Design a protein with these regions (language model features):
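Terminal "cap-and-tail" regions of soluble proteins that handle hydrophobic small molecules
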Residues: 2-42, 135-195
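Amphipathic alpha-helical protein-protein interaction segments
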Residues: 12-19, 63-70, 118-121
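Calcium-regulated, polybasic anionic-phospholipid
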Residues: 45
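A solvent-exposed, acidic/Ser-Thr-rich amphipathic alpha-helical stretch
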Residues: 48-109
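Short, low-complexity, polar/charged sequence segments that are solvent-exposed and flexible
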Residues: 80-81, 127-131, 168-174
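Short, cysteine-centered beta-strand-loop-beta hairpins and adjacent loop/turn segments enriched
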Residues: 83-88, 114-125, 157-166
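Glycine-rich loops and low-complexity Gly/Arg-rich segments
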Residues: 85-88, 117, 132-136, 174-178
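Exposed beta-sheet edge and beta->alpha loop/turn motif
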Residues: 106-145, 149-155
C-alpha cells in the first residue's frame, strides 16, 4: 500500500513519482471534502456542487448514532446537519492509502469537531476520526477522481462526556478513577479464584 501524510512526504516506497503526486492530489481533495462537510457555515448549494459529485450512488454514512446509505440520503443528511447544527473541524492529520493497482483506497482524517451549538456559552471539542473508503474513476479528460463509497465518523462517548463542563470533571476525576480501581479489584479477585 502506498501512503502519504499531511507533511507531504511519502511514507511508503512509491515506484513512480506519479503515485506520490496522485496521493497528494487525493489528500488535498479529502482535505477539501472534510472542510466542506464539517463547516456548517457552508451552504447546501456548495455541498451539492463540491461534495455530491464525489459520492458514489451506494455511499454510506455511519457514526455512533446512525447509519444511512444512498447518495440522495447522504446529500439530504449533510444539508440537514448544516441547517440544524453549528460546528467546524480542525484537521490534525490526514492520510491517504491506495491499494495495489490504484483502483481504490482509504483516506483517514484525525481532528477535532468543534460543536458550537451554544457557542456563546461553550464550544465543545469532540475528537473525531473520519474514514472515507473510495474507488478511483477516470474522467473524460483523463484525470482521476475519487468516488466515496463509505464515510465513517468515529468519536468516543467517553470523550463526549469528559468534555461537558461540570459533568466532565465528575466523569474524569471520580467515575473513571473509581471504575479503574473497581476493575483492578475484580481482576485481582478473578486471578485469586483461578489460582
Amino acid at each position: 500500500m502506498t501512503k502519504a501524510s499531511t507533511s507531504g512526504r511519502g511514507q511508503g516506497n512509491p515506484s513512480r513519482g506519479g503515485e506520490l503526486a496522485l496521493i497528494q492530489q487525493l489528500e488535498e481533495r479529502f482535505r477539501r471534502l472534510t472542510l466542506l462537510l464539517y463547516d456548517t457555515s457552508v451552504p447546501a448549494r456548495v455541498l451539492d456542487e463540491e461534495v455530491v459529485p464525489f459520492l458514489a450512488e451506494d455511499v454510506s454514512f455511519t457514526d455512533p448514532w446512525q447509519r444511512g446509505a444512498g447518495r440522495e440520503t447522504y446529500r439530504r443528511g449533510a444539508a440537514g446537519f448544516h441547517c440544524m447544527f453549528s460546528f467546524d473541524f480542525d484537521i490534525h492529520q490526514l492520510n491517504v492509502q491506495l491499494e495495489e493497482g490504484h483502483e481504490k483506497g482509504r483516506a483517514i482524517v484525525d481532528g477535532v469537531m468543534n460543536l458550537k451549538q451554544f457557542s456563546w456559552l461553550y464550544t465543545y471539542p469532540l475528537r473525531t476520526i473520519l474514514v472515507f473508503d473510495f474507488t478511483l474513476v477516470r474522467t473524460p479528460g483523463g484525470d482521476v477522481r475519487p468516488l466515496v463509497h463509505a464515510h465513517e465518523e468515529m468519536w468516543s462517548f467517553g470523550d463526549m462526556i469528559a468534555a461537558v463542563p461540570g459533568v466532565g470533571w465528575v466523569y474524569t476525576k471520580l467515575f473513571r478513577k473509581g471504575f479503574s480501581y473497581g476493575f483492578l479489584a475484580a481482576s485481582a479477585i478473578c486471578r485469586w479464584i483461578r489460582q
